[in-house]
Regions:
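Short amphipathic alpha-helical segments
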Residues: 33-37, 84-86, 189-193
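Rossmann-like dinucleotide-binding cores of NAD(P)H-dependent redox enzymes
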Residues: 1, 84-132
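Short acidic loop-to-helix transition motifs that present clustered carboxylates
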Residues: 4-9, 50-52, 103
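FAD-site-proximal beta/loop scaffold in flavoenzymes
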Residues: 41-67, 154-209
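Beta1/beta-strand and adjacent pyrophosphate-binding region of the FAD-binding site
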Residues: 67-77
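Feature captures the FAD/FMN-dependent oxidoreductase FAD-binding
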Residues: 1-36, 132-145, 150-153, 176-178, ...
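N-terminal Rossmann-fold NAD(P) dinucleotide-binding loop
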Residues: 80-81
Length: 209
């Protein structure tokens, strides 16, 4: 417990101390967006934001305060909803959660009549993509440009692609952006420390020793 595997030497020690080592790793590498740099001041990965808030609550220290701020959350899953709930609880001025998929195409669409429940909910926008960030003269985040998308196939039998709806662009005020996009796999350090082979997609590959 309370021990990190950071180097090949750490792994060699485990192998000497135990008859077998079972590598059980989850996907902790948070997905990002091209060209967007997370700084944990104005732009967060959801897991980092939620971790910071939880530590503040447990330690009795000041919360990552979103009071009177405009918050945009990219990602319409449960983690994004958790971030939205915290933002509202902390007194954010506005909260907008964006999801590229249409509601009826999401994993939770069949649960508790979700899509009918969220009709008219101004805090979450389905079929919506983020186009770019806008910053003020000091380089601070001030707004996010978004647009609606339609999912359609260009040819018969092809999977649908997200097509931007021309003329649907609008600006959302934002001093805080939270990326709740899921995970792309385990963090690189665990592979490097253990010498385990990876697949081209970055997952565990057969033949690792």
């Amino acid at each position: 417990l309370n021990w990190e595997l950071n180097s090949p030497e750490d792994f060699e020690k485990l192998q000497k101390d135990f008859a077998a080592v079972v590598l059980c790793v989850g996907g902790r590498k948070a997905k990002g967006l091209p060209g967007i740099q997370v700084d944990n001041k104005q732009i967060y990965h959801a897991k980092d934001f939620l971790t910071e808030v939880t530590k503040d609550m447990l330690n009795g220290t000041e919360l990552a305060n979103l009071k009177d701020k405009d918050v945009v959350i990219i990602g319409g899953g449960d983690t994004g909803v958790d971030c939205a709930a915290i933002a509202l609880a902390q007194g954010a001025r506005t909260v907008h959660q964006l999801e590229m998929q249409e509601c009826d195409a999401t994993a939770n669409s069949a649960r508790d009549n979700l899509c009918n429940i969220v009709i008219g909910d101004y805090t979450i926008s389905y079929g919506t993509m983020m186009k770019r960030l806008l910053r003020d003269e000091e380089g601070k985040l001030k707004a996010v440009e978004v647009a609606q998308v339609e999912w359609r196939s260009e040819r018969s039998g092809a999977l649908p692609d997200a097509m931007e709806v021309l003329g649907s662009e609008k600006l959302l005020r934002a001093q805080v952006l939270i990326l709740a996009l899921g995970f792309s796999g385990p963090e690189d350090e665990i592979f490097e420390a253990c010498g385990v082979k990876r697949s081209p997609a970055g997952m565990l590959a057969d033949g690792g020793e």
